[in-house]
Amino acid sequence: MAAASSGEKEKERPGGGLGAAGGNSTRERLLSALEDLEVLSRELIEMLAISRNQKLLQSGEENQVLELLIHRDGEFQELMKLALNQGKIHHEMQVLEKEVEKRDSDIQQLQKQLKEAEQILATAVYQAKEKLKSIEKARKGAISSEEIIKYAHRISASNAVCAPLTWVPGDPRRPYPTDLEMRSGLLGQMNNPSTNGVNGHLPGDALAAGRLPDVLAPQYPWQSNDMAMNMLPPNHSHDFLLEPPGHNKENEDDVEVMSTDSSSSSSDSD
C-alpha cells in the first residue's frame, strides 16, 4: 500500500515518475529525481520501522519500493552524467563566446583600418586623376625648350624676383648685381692685383684723404660709406695724420751735418 501511495505521489508531482517530460531542463529533471529519491527513501525507512515494531513481514511492498528507489537512483546518475556533459559544453561555449568577441573586435579594428585605407586611396586616386589632367593639358599646350631658355634670358637680363629695399618705381637697377658689377666691386678689386696696385693695400693718397678710391667706391645708394670705411686695414687707422718721413726734423739735422762735413773737407783740400 505504501508503494501504491508513492506511485500516486510520483504521478501527481510535475516531472516525476519514470516518464518525466523530456521538454524540461536538466536542472528541473535533476531536482525532480532527487525529490523522488527522498520520498522513496522516507517511505522505505518508515516501512522498515513499522515492520520491525509490529514484527510483520511484508517483503513484497518493501521490494517494490526498493526497486523504485534503485530505478530512480539510476535515472539520477544518468542525469548527473548529462549535467556534467552539459557543463563541459557550457564551458566550451563560454570560451568560444570570448573567442568570438575577440575576433569581432579584431574584425572591427580591421574594418576601421580598411576604411582609413579606402579614404587614403580615394584621395590618392583623385590626386592622380588631377595630375593626369594637368599632364594632358600640358601636353596639349606644350612649350619648346628654346622659348623657355629665351624667357629665362629675358628675366636674367632685365629684372629678377626681388628688389633692394631702396628700390623705387623707375629704377633700372636689378635686384642683385651682375657678374660685371661683382668684378668691379670691392671684392673683385681685392682679388685682382693688376688694378691700380690694389692687393689688400689701398693707395696712400686715398688713405690720407680718408676715402676709398673711385674703383672701390660703392656703386649703389644702399651701400653705406660706413661699410667702406670698415673695410680699410686696421694698421692705417692712425697713420693718416702722420707727416711723410722726408719732412721729419731729425732728417733735416742729418742733412745739415752732412753739408757741414762736405764744406770742411773742401776747405782742407784747398
Curated annotation (Swiss-Prot):
Subunit organization: Component of the Mediator complex, which is composed of MED1, MED4, MED6, MED7, MED8, MED9, MED10, MED11, MED12, MED13, MED13L, MED14, MED15, MED16, MED17, MED18, MED19, MED20, MED21, MED22, MED23, MED24, MED25, MED26, MED27, MED29, MED30, MED31, CCNC, CDK8 and CDC2L6/CDK11. The MED12, MED13, CCNC and CDK8 subunits form a distinct module termed the CDK8 module. Mediator containing the CDK8 module is less active than Mediator lacking this module in supporting transcriptional activation.
Keyword Nucleotide-binding: no
UniProt-annotated location(s): Nucleus
Region ranges (Disordered): 1-25, 231-270
Biased composition (Low complexity): 259-270
Protein name stated in the entry: Mediator of RNA polymerase II transcription subunit 4
Coiled-coil ranges per UniProt: 24-48, 90-131
Keyword Iron appears in the UniProt entry: no
